């Protein structure tokens, strides 16, 4: 899948005002090491403390009304799960998140607190992913 500049502009317009504007600063050490100007964006200042909510909100916002009513299923062991759960709840979209066995309790709990139904199952990411695909087919 290729991403074009127009895709980025469309995503920006779709999520603008619905996620935090976060600052960025020049990373002196990384700039010195690479010989290029490197900047770091502080996405940890988002509500879920991760840039992942940008992509989650972009995708959820693009769903049709019928798709929204059916809900979404995602697989993640952490930050993406929280981004999907948080924005799905804000948009009134039912969300089920499959998290692999061994996912830290804090990630599971935060995802539930954001309003998602959480299923903890599957050995590793591949096992949880297979389960999520199976659930999506139903």
Show the residue positions of the predicted features.
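PLP-dependent amino-acid enzyme catalytic core
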Residues: 1-138
């Amino acid at each position: 899948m290729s991403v074009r500049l127009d895709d980025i502009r469309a995503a920006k317009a779709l999520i603008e005002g619905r996620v935090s504007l976060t600052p960025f600063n020049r990373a002196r050490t990384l700039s010195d090491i690479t010989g290029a100007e490197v900047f770091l964006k502080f996405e940890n200042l988002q509500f879920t403390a991760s840039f992942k909510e940008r992509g989650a909100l972009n995708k959820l916002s693009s769903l049709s009304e019928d798709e929204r009513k059916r809900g979404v299923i995602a697989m993640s062991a952490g930050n993406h799960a929280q981004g999907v759960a948080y924005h799905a709840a804000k948009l009134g979209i039912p969300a089920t998140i499959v998290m692999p066995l061994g996912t830290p309790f804090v990630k599971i709990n935060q995802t539930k607190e954001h309003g998602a139904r959480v299923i903890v199952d599957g050995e590793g990411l591949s096992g949880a992913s297979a389960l999520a695909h199976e659930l999506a087919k139903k």
